[in-house]
Amino acid sequence: MSFTVHIVDDEESLRDSLGFLFASRGIATRTWAAGADLLAEWPLADCGCLILDVRMEGMSGPQLLDALQARPEGLVPPVIFLTGHADVPLAVQSLKAGAFDFVEKPFNDNHIVDIALSAIAAHEGRLAEAQAREAVAARRASLSAREAEVMALMLEGLMNKQIAERLGIAMRTVEVHRSRVLAKMGARNIADLARMT
């Protein structure tokens, strides 16, 4: 998927210059004059990262980040804050609140592009991890109650005979359940199963 850098700044000249900078590097952008405008269209499937001015009329950058994190849609793309004022406490607070980076204006063009590309790469990794977790959860949900019991005991390290004794079932039945668990979970062996759960 091709991601877009979304820029929120109440200063039109900065929005335009950042849009031009990213476009000159072949990176798609979309600009917003206010955080409320972005929120009105959220969630944005193409959002790879957000570049937010810290101080804006109406909703500040940190307030916009808080609003996005409070939304039920889930994963918020990485946020890069821009500020015209060196404010170490605000930078620390923003990073603790989940910002990807904090950049002081004026900034080096290559530096802001590199940070945005790193943010997009981090977001792609987080999306891939979330999709993998969802796939494992869906596979786990496909297990019968007995298969789920057998899987839990397999993950405890019990052998088929021990599982059979614990559950009061035949060892051959355990072998069938074990085989089904591995097949449904898409695991070749117990080590694969342990890695995905």
Swiss-Prot record:
Superkingdom classification of source: Bacteria
Residues annotated as domain Response regulatory: 4-120
Post-translational modification: Phosphorylated by DctS.
Alphabetical list of SMART domains matching this protein: HTH_LUXR, REC
Organism: Rhodobacter capsulatus (Rhodopseudomonas capsulata)
Residue numbers bearing the 4-aspartylphosphate modification: 53
GO biological process: phosphorelay signal transduction system; regulation of DNA-templated transcription
Pfam family, one: Response_reg
Protein name, entry field: C4-dicarboxylate transport transcriptional regulatory protein DctR
Domain HTH luxR-type: from-to ranges: 136-197
This protein's UniProt keywords: Activator, Cytoplasm, DNA-binding, Phosphoprotein, Transcription, Transcription regulation, Two-component regulatory system
Function: Member of the two-component regulatory system DctS/DctR involved in the transport of C4-dicarboxylates. DctR functions as a transcriptional repressor of genes for C4-dicarboxylate transport.
InterPro entries (UniProt xref): CheY-like_superfamily, Sig_transdc_resp-reg_receiver, Tscrpt_reg_LuxR_C, WH-like_DNA-bd_sf
Keyword NAD: no
One term under GO cellular component: cytoplasm
Region feature Inter-domain linker, mapped onto this chain: 128-135
Sample GO molecular function, one term: DNA binding
Annotated localization: Cytoplasm
DNA-binding region, residue range(s): 160-179
Keyword Amino-acid biosynthesis tagged: no
